[in-house]
């Protein structure tokens, strides 16, 4: 087999591949063995039709497509390996010659992984992140904990205030007509949560239990139900009950309720401070890692093929669909609620997809430039770490991974980012 690679404009090129006649004949033989099993001919058992009779009746050309299906993948795979190229999309195959007892000649037009011209990636200036935890930070965390431990109690007197929960009946009308989904009874509405249409909750503030009011609002222009989008509406609202948050007293008992591992409020505050310090340190480390990667990517010169962006977009949509399924939703419902579709979703994701592809290509180039490798021991250590994290046997982790090659590549990327951080200014 012979292979010739011709680079065209951009990231596109053409492989011209010639396969020996012997391989061609072998593929035709294999195609016959496959096809003859499906043919019933009087006088012969199924699959036992003689080759000469088959060729006389159907013509040898009837085997060519099946033969090509057999020979092309192998020939193309060997050709890209021989040419040392990395296609990022399906090839455009053009058969120039295919017949028995002759060499197969075909071309494959392919888009290949782009060349990355690295810019400055050592000594990158990154902003230092403040990790000091103040007394105010601790108090705010304590207040958040107190809020989470709060109980809702009925407000016997007074009116609805921001932060209260109003138990309401409501019915909405557009142009004097009730609409589907616009009615609810004994609905607990947290005031200030932004759950309802903009302007609704603010008009409930100041009402007393037992009071009714017509709330005038307009549906947002981008509202998911197209028949309501942008239209004014009137909601008839009745307040049944007002509930307010009753915060627990900050004392040792509260501390023990909040965290069984502490005995006093002071111990709880100390633990909160430690957690905040660890959180800020972790956040700072992530920020620095993200920043050096983005700077290195921005400094590089790359002409990214559209095929790579589309592949990444497909991956991102699959990831998004998985997250939706975990929330009991699917893409069709999401499109319905948001008034969007697959094309609009991909358009929203496109910038992030371009960024992901650029970063991946730059990190791969840095790995190559700095000869970054991972050892078998490092891969084994990572597998053991995963086993401990998930509470699974090491063999089960290996079986779940299938191959550790992808894990090894992930470790290389991690090392590349470590290198950028260690060499930052």
Swiss-Prot record:
Which reaction is catalysed here? [protein]-peptidylproline (omega=180) = [protein]-peptidylproline (omega=0)
Q: Where is the PPIase FKBP-type domain?
A: 163-248
What processes in GO biological process is this protein linked to? 'de novo' cotranslational protein folding; cell division; chaperone-mediated protein folding; protein transport; protein unfolding
Gene3D superfamilies in the cross-refs? 3.10.50.40, Trigger factor ribosome-binding domain, Trigger factor, C-terminal domain
In which compartments does the protein localize?
Answer: Cytoplasm
Q: What is its EC number?
A: 5.2.1.8
- Which EC class is this protein assigned? isomerase
Q: Which UniProt keywords apply?
A: Cell cycle, Cell division, Chaperone, Cytoplasm, Isomerase, Rotamase
Record's GO cellular component terms? cytoplasm
Q: Molecular function (GO) terms listed?
A: peptidyl-prolyl cis-trans isomerase activity; protein folding chaperone; ribosome binding
A Pfam family per the record: Trigger_C
Q: Which family does it belong to?
A: Belongs to the FKBP-type PPIase family. Tig subfamily.
Report the function annotation for this chain: Involved in protein export. Acts as a chaperone by maintaining the newly synthesized protein in an open conformation. Functions as a peptidyl-prolyl cis-trans isomerase.
Report the NCBIfam families cross-referenced here.
Answer: tig
Q: What is known of its domains?
A: Consists of 3 domains; the N-terminus binds the ribosome, the middle domain has PPIase activity, while the C-terminus has intrinsic chaperone activity on its own.
* Name the UniProt record assigns to this protein: Trigger factor
Q: Which source organism does the UniProt entry give? A: Bacillus cereus (strain ATCC 14579 / DSM 31 / CCUG 7414 / JCM 2152 / NBRC 15305 / NCIMB 9373 / NCTC 2599 / NRRL B-3711)
Recite the lineage of the species.
Bacteria, Bacillati, Bacillota, Bacilli, Bacillales
Q: Which gene encodes it?
A: tig
């Amino acid at each position: 087999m012979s292979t010739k690679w011709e680079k065209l404009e951009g990231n596109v090129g053409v492989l011209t591949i010639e396969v020996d006649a012997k391989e061609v004949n072998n593929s035709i033989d294999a195609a016959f063995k496959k096809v003859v099993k499906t043919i019933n001919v009087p006088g012969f058992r199924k699959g036992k039709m003689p080759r000469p009779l088959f060729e006389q009746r159907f013509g040898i050309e009837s085997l060519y497509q099946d033969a090509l299906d057999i020979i092309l993948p192998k020939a193309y795979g060997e050709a890209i390996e021989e040419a040392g190229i990395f296609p990022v999309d399906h090839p455009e195959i053009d058969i120039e010659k295919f017949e028995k007892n002759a060499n197969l000649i075909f071309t494959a037009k392919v888009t290949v992984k782009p060349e990355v011209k690295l810019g400055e990636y050592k000594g990158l200036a990154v902003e230092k992140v403040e990790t000091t935890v103040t007394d105010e930070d601790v108090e705010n965390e304590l207040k958040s904990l107190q809020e989470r431990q709060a109980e809702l109690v009925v407000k016997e007197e007074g009116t609805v205030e921001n932060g209260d929960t109003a138990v309401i009946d409501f019915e909405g009308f557009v142009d004097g007509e009730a609409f589907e989904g616009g009615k609810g009874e004994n609905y607990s509405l947290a005031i200030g949560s932004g759950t309802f249409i903009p302007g609704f909750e603010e008009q409930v503030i100041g009402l007393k239990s037992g009071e009714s009011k017509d709330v005038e609002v307009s549906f947002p222009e981008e509202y998911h139900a197209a028949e309501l989008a942008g239209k004014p509406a009137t909601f008839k609202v009745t307040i049944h009950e007002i509930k307010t948050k009753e915060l627990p007293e900050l004392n040792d008992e509260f501390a023990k309720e909040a965290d069984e591992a502490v005995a006093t409020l002071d111990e709880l505050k100390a633990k909160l401070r430690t957690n905040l310090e660890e959180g800020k340190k972790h956040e700072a480390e992530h920020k620095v890692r993200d920043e050096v990667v983005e700077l290195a990517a921005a400094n590089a010169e790359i002409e990214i093929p559209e095929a790579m962006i589309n592949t990444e977009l497909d991956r991102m949509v699959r990831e998004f669909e998985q997250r939706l399924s975990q929330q009991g939703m699917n893409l069709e419902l999401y499109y319905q609620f948001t008034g969007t579709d697959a094309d609009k979703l991909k358009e929203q994701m496109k910038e992030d997809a371009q960024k992901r592809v650029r970063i991946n290509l730059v990190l791969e180039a840095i790995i190559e430039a700095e000869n970054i490798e991972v050892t078998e021991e490092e891969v084994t250590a990572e597998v053991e770490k995963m086993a401990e994290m998930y509470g699974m046997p090491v063999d089960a982790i290996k079986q779940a991974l299938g191959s550790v090659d992808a894990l090894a590549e992930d470790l290389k990327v991690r090392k590349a980012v470590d290198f950028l951080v260690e060499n930052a200014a």
